């Protein structure tokens, strides 16, 4: 793999990184650098605690500009969002209470370009957006 990559690492960006990097990347850990963005402070702490040396975990939301945003912390962490839940739609499904907002926090959002520049990243090979 080193020969194929010419001794460079793949750069993987995970936007909305709750749960961490997808397990299918686990066999290639030594060949990639992961940049994980997770705005939920609860999930960020878990990611930071369990991250490998090849991962940079950033507690930030991404947006089209640098600005303050509202973030809705939901009962189930993985469904927290900058958008309030639409219960007119969600109540049509089982388990809609997982979207109950427990708290609204204010946090700074920034652009992907700005965040990558701060980390010295010029190029990205893969990006997963789950927001």
Label each PLM-derived region with a short phrase.
Residues 1-131:
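Phosphate/nucleotide-binding beta-alpha loop and adjacent structural elements of enzyme active sites
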């Amino acid at each position: 793999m080193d020969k194929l990559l010419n001794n460079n690492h793949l750069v993987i960006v995970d936007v909305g990184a709750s749960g961490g990097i997808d397990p299918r990347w686990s066999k290639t850990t030594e060949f990639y650098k992961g940049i994980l963005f997770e705005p939920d402070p609860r999930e960020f702490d878990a990611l930071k605690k369990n991250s490998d040396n090849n991962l940079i975990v950033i507690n930030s939301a991404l947006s089209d500009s640098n600005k303050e945003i509202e973030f809705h912390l939901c009962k189930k962490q993985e469904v927290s969002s900058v958008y309030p839940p639409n219960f007119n739609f969600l109540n049509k499904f089982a388990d809609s209470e997982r979207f109950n907002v427990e708290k609204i926090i204010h946090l700074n959002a920034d652009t992907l370009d700005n965040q990558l520049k701060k980390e010295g990243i010029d190029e990205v090979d893969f990006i997963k957006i789950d927001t």
